[in-house]
Amino acid sequence: MMIAIPGVLSGRTLDHVRTLVTEAEWVDGNATSGHQSALAKKNRQLPEDGDAAREAGGIILDALGATPLFIAAALPLKVFPPLFNLYGGGERFDTHVDNAIRMKRGTDFRIRSDLSATLFLNDPDSYDGGELVVEDTLGTHKVKLGAGDMILYPASSLHHVTPVTRGERLCSFFWIQSMVRDDGARRTLFDLDTAIQAVAADRGQDDPAIIRLTGVYHNLLRRWAEA
């Protein structure tokens, strides 16, 4: 399931994150690459243990926890600390698939990467190129969202970032281990949750049918979740 999540960051919070990371020192983007990705990746990245990345990443994690659409779609168990990348002057990231297991160096923190997320931090009209292109069974999808908006997609997807030919593309990226490993099951739960909320808005949360459907949702989650 691929889903756009608008307004994860906005206003002063977005401005603060953008200021934190743009004023920091950037390094070669292969700092977090696996072998396959290192051959494909041409961009810059913030050192993951730097003060700017830690502070900005913490702000993003807090924002995710306050974003109901993200919680409903991802059913997150663990979130990898957000990283930050910068593309400009023809920089790109050729087709690759993300590593199945992500580890934070120097710690025992590791996750299974069920979902990948890209949070756009600058306006799309400030740069040319830089589209995130994701391939799935339904075809090829080009993504270039507004500042503060995020795209969530299965980490098993082949994807690439097209060359940035004008300006700079600034994003945060990270991975999520979901409580529900299977993408199809996770999609079923999301669709059911969305339908329940839509009907409840008309009939009320105390409607007997809404209560029964909510029970079905939680029983399916109980069957499929790993927590």
Swiss-Prot record:
Q: Give one Pfam family.
A: 2OG-FeII_Oxy_3
Disulfide pattern: none
| NCBIfam families, sorted | PRK05467.1-2, PRK05467.1-3, PRK05467.1-4
InterPro entries given in the database record: Oxoglu/Fe-dep_dioxygenase_dom, PKHD_C, PKHD_hydroxylase, Pro_4_hyd_alph, Pro_4_hyd_alph_FE2OG_OXY
Looking at the keywords, is Glycosyltransferase present? Answer: no
Cofactor(s) this protein requires: Fe(2+); L-ascorbate
**PANTHER family, A to Z:** PKHD-TYPE HYDROXYLASE YBIX
Domain of life from the UniProt record: Bacteria
Q: Where does Fe cation bind?
A: 96, 98, 159
Gene3D superfamilies from the UniProt entry? q2cbj1_9rhob like domain, Rabenosyn, Rab binding domain
- EC id: 1.14.11.-
Biological process per Gene Ontology, one example term: intracellular iron ion homeostasis
This protein is called PKHD-type hydroxylase Swit_4046
| Residues where 2-oxoglutarate binds | 169
Cofactor note from UniProt?
Answer: Binds 1 Fe(2+) ion per subunit.
Q: Which GO terms describe its molecular function?
A: 2-oxoglutarate-dependent dioxygenase activity; iron ion binding; L-ascorbic acid binding
Residue stretches making up the Fe2OG dioxygenase domain: 78-178
Keyword annotations for this protein, in alphabetical order, are:
Dioxygenase, Iron, Metal-binding, Oxidoreductase, Vitamin C
